[in-house]
Amino acid sequence: MNRNKYLFIVVSFLLWFPQFLYVPIFSPYMETLGGKYTFIGFVLSSYGIMQLLCRLPIGIFSDVKKVRKPFIIFGMLASMLSCVIFLLTDSLGWILAARALAGISAATWVAFTVLYPRYFADHEVHRAMGSISFIVVLAQFLGMSFSGSIVSEWGWKGPFWIAGSFSILGVILSLFIYEPKEGIEREPLKVKELATVIKEPSLMKVALLSILAHSIIFSTMFGFTSNYALTIGFHASELTFIVFAFMIPHAIATLFIGRVLVPLLGEWNALKMAFFFASVFTLLIPFVQSRELFLAVQIFSGFSLGLIFPLLLGLAIEKIASEKRATAMGAYQAIYAIGIFTGPFFAGIFNSLMGIKAGFYFVGVLGLVATLLIIIWGKNHAKLAVEKSVKKSKAGA
């Protein structure tokens, strides 16, 4: 069984590593091909819209068929085909198609997260999800770290050659994944149950905040940050420093939030602070002309955004009944993909109309909107908590 776990972990890594290997250089690459910011934003947003359209149907269909492996193989094939298209053409239309395929590939992640826990006993499921989540972060970090250096050595196509090679290996290895007959079974998703979960007010609030958070990160670090960095004197090989400056604090923040910030401030206050600082440091980016100061801003931006995502993930299912949490998580993941689509799409339009700085102002304001919503909702949550406390004390008396 250990061999099966290790193989699955490797395949999971090979799904994400190729997709993030070219992310820091992707927008500048399209710019060199003559892509306007509006088009670049649309290409970046296609990754999110395909996840929005495909993630829930893939989850539901795999539940109905009670198999995951075919969907995993399909995801690896889509990833490989995406990389091959990037390699074979400089056509902006085909680049859009290739990035959309990458989005379909990412949507199959739902099948990965259902199959992997079946290698574990019931009480080890959280450990399983922790392991596979770490692999995603590791793949993202390693992929993004090397892209700038690869471009300097082998040109703009270099990352796609390496990504294509790794994705071919991923397809081959995915054929040997073991899908156990026994393990944790999930009931097929019922439409009525999905509708009930989606109407849950707490989930909708958190999902809206997550849309705003994903709009910020996919318009900045996973979007136009590299373009702006190149305009203030960074070279392609130095994009690696920006990735390190952002991603290391981003990862550290995920550990910091649960152990320090939430016990100290509470969930809603911690979230308010994180969104506010993420907004401030995003709004600062267009004012920075010094490379050293730019890296400093990325450090604080990465840390602030790193606080937000685990907080939202916990809040998404906190008030959902345990038997509906899998459904809630599927719905939550599908809904926040709206942010992966809308953020880069509108940032690209603003950049085209008013220059590269405009997109940062746009998503920075989104962060302030999120902060305002949290202040309003946080007061309501505090009021409800006081009312519950009063009722309990009266009942006790």
Predicted regions and their residues:
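C-terminal membrane-cytosol helix-exit motif in multi-pass small-molecule transporters
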Residues: 164-183, 370-378
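Helix-loop boundary and gating motifs at the non-cytosolic
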Residues: 2-48, 204-205, 215-232
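Helix-to-loop junctions at the C-terminal end of transmembrane segments
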Residues: 54-66, 253-266, 351
